[in-house]
Design a protein with these regions (language model features):
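Non-catalytic cap/lid and distal C-terminal segments of serine-dependent acyl enzymes
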Residues: 1-235
Length: 235
């Protein structure tokens, strides 16, 4: 079952749309309630609607008995800017979970049933938010994640990314590198140092993707035991 929902967000100070896919009445046996829930974050330039319809999410939801919630990322790298009433990280990482559970009582409230994933920019957001809100998410899935957002944005070829995007979203490089909320690698260390249980991590990418060279070693050394799946190009 596919539903497009709208709810007022305190973090965004406005109404926000999100898409919900439930494993119910979709040609398969209905899944057992309450449903485990996956929050799927779009990449840069992609809308929630594109993700909801371009990928076979309804079939995956029905096959595996998992509800899927897809919000818009708004090219904001899931950062928080209260001065602009644009706290995308707070909205998606925490508030959207509360809103969706209240609107759809069939969703599980248990941490062990709550997952977050994303593609590219959404992969960065899933890692950053999953490691920040460790009490909410049990698993993180990353598809070609832009884990080193500073390297990606500051070294992007001309015309690929707006030149002022990194300072507008993250400030300077030092502020990004030192922030457990913005830098997923610092987020891993912060979670462990504070005694919080980091979510499990699964990562998927092509062999020629520009994933950070130290990502696997850092995650592995943190005892998160990441699972990595590499794909070769058929061309």
């Amino acid at each position: 079952m596919y539903i497009k929902a709208t709810a007022k967000s305190k973090a965004l100070m406005r109404g926000a749309d999100f898409h919900v896919i439930l494993p119910y009445h979709d040609g398969y046996p209905d899944a057992k309630r309450p449903y485990p829930t996956l929050y799927f974050l779009p990449g840069f330039s992609a809308s929630a609607e594109e993700i909801a319809f371009a990928l076979p999410l309804r079939q995956m939801s029905a096959l595996y008995g998992v509800a899927i919630v897809v919000p818009d990322g708004e090219n904001a790298f899931y950062t928080d800017h209260p001065e602009r009433a644009l706290c995308m990280g707070e909205y998606i990482g925490e508030e959207l979970v509360e809103i969706s559970r209240k609107m759809f009582p069939c969703l599980s409230h248990e941490r062990e049933d709550t997952f977050i994933c994303g593609i590219s920019m959404g992969g960065y957001g899933a890692a950053a938010l999953g490691l920040h809100y460790t009490e909410i998410y049990a698993k993180i899935a990353l598809f070609s994640p832009a884990l080193e957002a500073d390297t990606l944005l500051l070294n992007a070829p001309e015309g690929i990314m707006p030149p002022g995007l990194f300072p507008a979203l993250f400030g300077n490089r030092e502020a990004y590198a030192s922030s457990p909320r913005l830098n997923p690698f610092r987020g891993v260390r912060d979670a462990l140092d504070s005694g919080r249980m980091p979510p499990g991590v699964w990562m998927c990418c092509g062999e020629e993707d520009l994933i950070p060279a130290d990502a696997i070693s850092i995650l592995s050394s943190s005892m998160m035991q990441p699972k990595l799946l590499l794909f070769s190009s058929p061309v």
